[in-house]
């Protein structure tokens, strides 16, 4: 086997004929500026080629179903192993996917409960029992000696109906007696019961007196009767002591000896909330139900109904529903013009939930000869009808704005039915284990075998071993604060990536090439060492690990470093260094200069004092927050810190940002629970600059997102040639007919279907990739067509448009955030998360601000090199200098040390976090002995 992986002549995206060598079974870090070509080399070249080779082993028929797998633009790659990519982008949005299901720990717990769990009755709390027919006969013979008994088969348990057919069926089978609601009666033709009442019905199989001289004969008869009764009662029989009128149940299945309820034999799917066997019947295994939120139905009770106080109805219209409400309110001496707060509670209850009495509608309104009487079901029932019956996306979106998620009242958020929740091991059901964080769960698993009997221990030993192994992998990647029932959709990119990393370590594969994209995202310095050790463990198992990373600790721990640069975009794409970390420190690449201390991000000489105004948030209780009160000083650079899972994102992204978005933009996103907010009037808007893509189609690009493309098109429309031809702005759009090339629909390329081979994308032979038709391209500004402008990098465009004031600021903003290397027309699907975030930031920078804007950024250093961070922070400092407030959630110490004000959450993640440990200037926060952040911050402030 080759001792190394070699890449020759890689030219994907901006790579310039790159040759690299990667030692096999090493931990290799790819580093360099954002946009230098790291991901192009790791994912778009090495991973893409590995995946293509794997798919080529399939038959042509199978390949037809696997989508496109183009060969990357590379001369050759030798020594390539099977490749597994672990990226951040593939977070699962399915509400049924949880940490437990993703890591398979929950699957092993289901197996453990199915094989070693003890069942208890959800009715009486008694331990469930099960018997063989022989054991049942023995117990009846001993318990009912010398007594007269009835042997019955239960048919109906607490259900409504007249049961005429059931009685007739039993009569035809030859049975003479039936017990209905505790009373034994003779079965007669046409017998029935009250169909509107709940009934318990048992058929009498036999009656006998035990004891006496004919014991053996009686035993034989009893055995036959029990067998017949078991078949008729589907494994359950009832013995009625005639003299004492006492009933007792026996079953071949798990059964409550007191009430007679029986369970199916346990199987793993009974404990799955994704299976009909185990899911709660009300919420279908989701743990939550949709409820109508009255605060959203009537947000302002100072308004009257005529003016639109009831939002779903809007303002008064000449419609039946308003006539009904008016008629109802008249009974309480109110009208549609009475403010809601002045309408009696009983009247509003009837408006919302309906009235039992008929309402009189005046004959003039309905154009009849006499008054019209109607019933009224209420606004809530009307809304529910829309929710249930309108399948259109518009109808659902309209109804969604009045809905809030509430905990399911049936399962109390546990997702499982009551039978599944009745199985216990060491006094815990499976849902209680899923609620524990990983650290608590490990303690439970470590001691559970001490609380099992010998049989349970024998069954559980291998299952417990597998669970313990997977738990330890999660702890190793710093996810001790997560609970198994945490939805995958609520995880950050870094968290979901580290879960997949833990799953891969658990899979025990060898001779594999793993490629990871910044696994340290969202990870506190405290947990970094454990993550590095996990990657080394993956390497030591016999795998090669490539990590695209900017983290200093990761680089120093690597066996091999590939530094790509020297700059980004067209000025990048070259290997400026490859070798060991020790050798790299001796070079003068940009990365090496930051590692050896030649360059660094300077600590500001003084911190801002702000504008004296604040934003105060009190009583925050979302997720793990423990009644947090926090004050944000405005006009400052605020950094929110803390270990992973300490509550930073819950406080900012799930509480503060939705509150402000609802206030300024009537956003539908609901904030987490909080008590109050003060000081909103001190800001005029909130801007959330996240890392989601700026567009999901190849047609969107930085020019269209920032809005500068509209200005560029208008510039071309105003040119003399365009005016002579009568061109409008649409002529210069590649999205609409007119000016675009119709041969390719404005894409610039055509997709050729190859049937059993991958589709091939070739440049359009008519426009040659220009996207526009010949006539449109004849209109030129300073010798350049609209297609030439889209093909310019931002740096080129800044020079080109330097004398065009309506265009320059928007393009200059892109340059200021370090995106000078990207093209104006570059497809948004090729931009990284960090690049997308900076395009959004540039768009905001180009807008006129009032100096009262609040900007929120969640880990903006994701995907950024030391130099990129310096440029980004300069931009953010300028925003604050203009009077705005910037709140950043961040672990990167180069950002934390630049803060004017720090809010430190912790001390741990999950249940051990959720408190505000300290706040203030970095120098003050660094003195806190309880905080992990403080220990690391104190070192960089020296």
Locations of regions flagged by a protein language model:
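Conserved phosphate-binding elements of NTP-dependent enzyme cores
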Residues: 1-942
């Amino acid at each position: 086997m080759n001792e190394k992986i070699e890449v020759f002549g890689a030219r994907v995206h901006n790579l310039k004929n790159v040759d690299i060598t990667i030692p096999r079974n090493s931990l290799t870090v790819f580093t360099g500026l954002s946009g230098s070509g790291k991901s192009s080399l790791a994912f778009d070249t090495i991973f893409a080629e590995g995946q293509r080779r794997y798919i080529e082993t399939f038959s042509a028929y199978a390949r037809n179903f696997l989508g496109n797998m183009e060969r990357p633009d590379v001369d050759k790659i030798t020594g390539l192993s099977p490749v597994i990519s672990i990226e951040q982008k593939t977070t699962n949005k399915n509400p049924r996917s949880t940490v437990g299901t993703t890591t398979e720990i929950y699957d092993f717990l289901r197996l453990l409960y199915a094989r070693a769990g003890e069942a208890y009755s959800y009715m009486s709390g008694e331990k469930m029992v099960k018997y063989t027919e022989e054991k049942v006969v023995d117990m009846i013979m001993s318990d009912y000696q010398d007594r007269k008994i009835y042997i019955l088969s239960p048919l109906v348990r607490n259900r409504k109906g007249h049961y005429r057919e059931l009685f007739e069926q039993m009569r035809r089978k030859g049975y003479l007696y039936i017990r209905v609601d505790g009373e034994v009666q003779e079965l007669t033709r046409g017998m029935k019961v009250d169909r509107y009442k709940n009934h318990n019905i048992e058929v009498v199989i036999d009656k006998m007196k035990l004891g006496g001289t004919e014991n053996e004969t009686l035993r034989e008869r009893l055995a036959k009767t029990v067998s017949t009764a078991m078949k008729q009662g589907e494994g359950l029989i009832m013995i009625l002591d005639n003299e004492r009128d006492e009933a007792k149940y026996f079953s071949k299945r798990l059964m409550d000896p007191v009430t007679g309820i029986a369970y199916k034999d346990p199987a793993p799917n009974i404990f799955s909330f994704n299976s009909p066997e185990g899911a709660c019947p009300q919420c279908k295994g989701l743990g939550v139900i949709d409820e109508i939120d009255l605060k959203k139905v009537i947000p302002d009770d100072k308004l009257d109904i005529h003016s639109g106080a009831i939002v779903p109805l809007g303002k008064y219209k000449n419609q039946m529903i308003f006539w009904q409400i008016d008629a109802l309110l008249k009974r309480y001496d109110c009208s549609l013009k009475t403010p809601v707060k002045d309408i009696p509670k009983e009247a509003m209850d009837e408006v919302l939930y309906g009235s039992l009495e008929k309402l009189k509608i005046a004959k003039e309104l309905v154009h009849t000869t006499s008054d019209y009487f109607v019933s009224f079901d209420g606004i809530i029932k009307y809304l529910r009808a829309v929710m249930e019956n309108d399948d259109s996306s518009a109808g659902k979106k309209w109804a969604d704005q009045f809905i809030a998620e509430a905990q399911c009242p049936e399962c109390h958020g546990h997702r499982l039915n009551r039978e599944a929740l009745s199985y216990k091991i060491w006094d815990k059901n499976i849902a209680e284990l899923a609620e524990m964080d990983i650290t608590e769960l490990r303690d439970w698993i470590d001691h559970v075998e001490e609380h099992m009997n010998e049989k349970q221990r024998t069954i559980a030993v291998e299952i417990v071993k597998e669970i313990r192994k997977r738990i330890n992998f999660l702890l190793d990647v710093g996810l001790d604060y997560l609970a198994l029932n945490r939805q995958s959709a609520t995880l950050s990119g870094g968290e979901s990536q580290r879960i997949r990393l833990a799953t891969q370590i658990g899979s025990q594969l060898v001779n594999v090439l793993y490629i990871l994209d910044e696994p340290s995202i969202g990870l506190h310095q405290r947990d970094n060492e454990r993550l590095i050790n996990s990657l080394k463990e993956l390497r030591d198992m016999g795998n090669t690990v490539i990590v695209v990373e900017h983290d200093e600790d990761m680089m120093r721990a690597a066996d091999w470093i590939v530094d790509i640069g020297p700059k980004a975009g067209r000025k990048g794409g070259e290997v400026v260094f490859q070798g060991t970390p020790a050798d790299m420190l001796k070079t003068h690449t940009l990365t090496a200069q930051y590692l050896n201390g030649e360059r660094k991000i300077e600590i500001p000489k003084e911190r801002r004092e702000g504008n004296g105004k604040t934003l105060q948030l009190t009583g925050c209780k979302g997720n793990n927050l423990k009644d947090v009160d926090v004050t944000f000083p405005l006009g400052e650079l605020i950094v929110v810190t803390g270990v992973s899972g300490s509550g930073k994102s819950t406080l900012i992204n799930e509480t503060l940002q939705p509150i402000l978005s609802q206030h300024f933009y009537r956003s539908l996103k609901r904030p987490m629970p909080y008590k109050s907010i003060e000081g909103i009037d001190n800001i005029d808007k909130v801007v959330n600059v996240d890392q989601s893509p700026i567009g999901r189609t190849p047609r969107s690009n930085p020019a269209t997102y920032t809005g500068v493309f509209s200005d560029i098109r208008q510039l071309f429309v105003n040119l003399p040639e365009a005016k002579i031809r009568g061109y409008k702005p649409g002529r210069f759009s590649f999205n609409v007919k007119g000016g675009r090339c119709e041969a390719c629909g404005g894409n610039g390329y055509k997709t050729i279907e190859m049937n059993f081979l991958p589709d091939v994308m070739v440049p359009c032979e008519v426009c040659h990739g220009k996207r526009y038709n010949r006539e449109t391209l004849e209109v030129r500004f300073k010798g350049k067509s609209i297609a030439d402008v889209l093909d310019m990098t931002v740096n080129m465009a800044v020079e080109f448009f330097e004398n065009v004031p309506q265009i320059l600021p928007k393009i200059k903003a892109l340059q200021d955030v370090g995106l000078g290397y990207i093209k104006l027309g570059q497809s948004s699907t090729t931009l990284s998360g960090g690049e997308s975030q900076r395009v959004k930031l540039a768009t905001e920078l180009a807008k006129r601000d009032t100096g009262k804007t609040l900007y929120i950024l969640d880990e903006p250093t994701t995907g950024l090199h030391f130099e990129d961070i310096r440029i980004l922070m300069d931009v953010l400092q300028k925003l604050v200098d203009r009077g705005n407030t910037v709140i950043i959630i961040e672990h990167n110490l180069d950002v934390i040390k630049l803060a004017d004000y720090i809010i430190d959450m912790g001390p741990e993640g999950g249940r051990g976090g959720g408190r505000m440990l300290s706040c203030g200037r970095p120098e003050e926060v660094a003195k806190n002995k309880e905080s992990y952040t403080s220990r690391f911050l104190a070192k960089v402030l020296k």
